[in-house]
């Protein structure tokens, strides 16, 4: 079928809305009419080259929600009409890693940046006669998708699509970073560096886990104000102010848990984050930096002598098939505020405006909302 999508053809160029050709679902694949797509900072890394796909052109988007329209042979637990969220981490349930309970590290994830379909190794999308590389095997910046069933999670049909799309990456990653990877305990003090979409979800996780003080650090004043509304007890504009402020509030003990959710992580800054981490504390690396940034600035002696932990995480250490419906159930019960995380909704043609707003610090999360006019 012919549809359209937001493509990039080379680094540091704007998104281009173009006609694309999309194949039908084959064995184990699902066709989805997209209703909403989250605008995550990771897709901007595609533009800058921080996350390079295996080739060009690239179809962006890895947060999305929609309605199943067709399924291929071998798909038994998903049917046309189902409302679904796309998980940027596939979860086969069969590989050794999934069997060990680490579905966020599914072996299918090895192909996230390769572009070829998991099902048969071919390319399902073409543009201008060339194969298209969809972001994390998804490509939610298009009103239609054909994806492997391992990336599809059924959800409660009463959840609004513009909210549901957030749990495909940002919310699940942030919330899980707090309650799973950081394992925040009641009464602990927590610092969250960067309070965009992922950071605001981590903040809500810290609140739910019973943190005593929650320190939110962000250079954008509006985001700091929003962080206070979401449950932060103290806010700071930069690491220098945070170092002094956290030391004063905790009498020099610092934060038991630090969660890094900045827009772009830099190895040179890691030591400043460890400096606000308490003795025996954990600094969780949730944010992603450039794949070319291989140098990390750490005082190894202090890391050892203070017994601090520097812990990486992907998808917040969660299980897509469990965590996505669970977080949406919490939303339905009024225990998770997702409505206020959607700052602005855009048309697909406004994608460059949306990313400009993100870079200017105007959004917690921007969302592309599809209409019949897009199809």
Mark where each language-model region is.
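C-terminal hydrophobic helical "lid"/dimerization subdomain
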Residues: 1, 240-241, 271-275, 279, ...
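Glycine-rich beta-strand-centered segment in the early N-terminal region that forms part
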Residues: 23-37, 50-99, 104, 112-114, ...
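Cysteine-cluster motifs in flexible loop/terminal segments that predominantly coordinate metals
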Residues: 88-150
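Mid-domain Rossmann-like dinucleotide-binding core that forms the NAD(H)/NADP(H) cofactor-binding site
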Residues: 143, 150-152, 156-244
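Residues in the short beta-alpha loop(s) of Rossmann-like NAD(P)-binding domains
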Residues: 11, 220, 289, 316
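Glycine-rich cofactor phosphate-binding loops and adjacent beta1-alpha1 units
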Residues: 182-185, 224-309, 374-375
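Redox-cofactor binding/interface segments in oxidoreductases and associated redox assembly factors
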Residues: 35, 86, 192, 259-260, ...
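Cytochrome P450 core scaffold surrounding the K-helix E-X-X-R motif
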Residues: 42-48
């Amino acid at each position: 079928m012919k549809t359209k999508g937001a493509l990039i053809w080379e680094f540091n160029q704007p998104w281009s809305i173009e006609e694309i050709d999309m194949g039908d679902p084959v064995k184990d694949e699902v066709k989805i009419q997209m209703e909403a797509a989250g605008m995550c900072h990771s897709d901007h890394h595609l533009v800058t080259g921080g996350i390079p796909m295996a080739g060009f052109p690239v179809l962006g988007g890895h947060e999305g929600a929609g309605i199943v329209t067709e399924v291929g042979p071998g798909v038994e637990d998903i049917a046309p009409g189902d409302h679904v969220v796309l998980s940027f981490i596939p979860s086969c349930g069969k590989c050794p890693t999934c069997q060990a309970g680490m579905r966020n590290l599914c072996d299918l994830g090895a192909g996230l940046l390769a572009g070829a379909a998991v099902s048969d190794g071919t390319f399902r999308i073409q543009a201008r006669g060339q194969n298209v590389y969809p972001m994390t095997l998804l490509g939610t910046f298009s009103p239609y998708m054909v994806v492997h069933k391992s990336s599809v999670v059924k959800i409660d049909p009463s959840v609004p699509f513009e909210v549901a799309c957030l749990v495909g990456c940002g919310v699940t990653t942030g919330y899980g970073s707090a309650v799973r990877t950081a394992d925040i305990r009641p009464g602990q003090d927590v610092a969250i560096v960067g309070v965009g979409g992922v950071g605001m979800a981590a903040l809500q996780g810290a609140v739910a886990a019973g943190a005593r003080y929650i320190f939110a650090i962000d250079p954008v004043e509006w985001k700091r104000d929003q962080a206070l509304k979401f449950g932060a007890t103290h806010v700071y504009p930069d690491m220098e102010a945070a170092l002094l402020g956290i030391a004063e509030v905790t009498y020099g003990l610092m934060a038991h848990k630090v969660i890094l959710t900045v827009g772009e992580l830099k190895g040179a800054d890691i030591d400043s984050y460890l400096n606000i981490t308490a003795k025996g504390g954990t600094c969780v690396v949730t944010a992603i930096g450039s794949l070319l940034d291989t140098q990390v600035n750490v005082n190894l002696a202090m890391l050892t002598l203070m017994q601090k932990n520097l812990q990486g995480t992907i998808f917040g250490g969660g299980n897509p098939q469990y965590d996505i419906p669970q977080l949406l159930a919490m939303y339905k019960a009024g225990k998770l505020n997702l409505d206020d995380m959607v700052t602005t909704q855009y048309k697909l043609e406004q994608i460059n405006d949306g990313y400009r707003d993100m870079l200017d610090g105007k959004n917690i999360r921007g969302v592309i909302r599809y209409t019949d006019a897009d199809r």
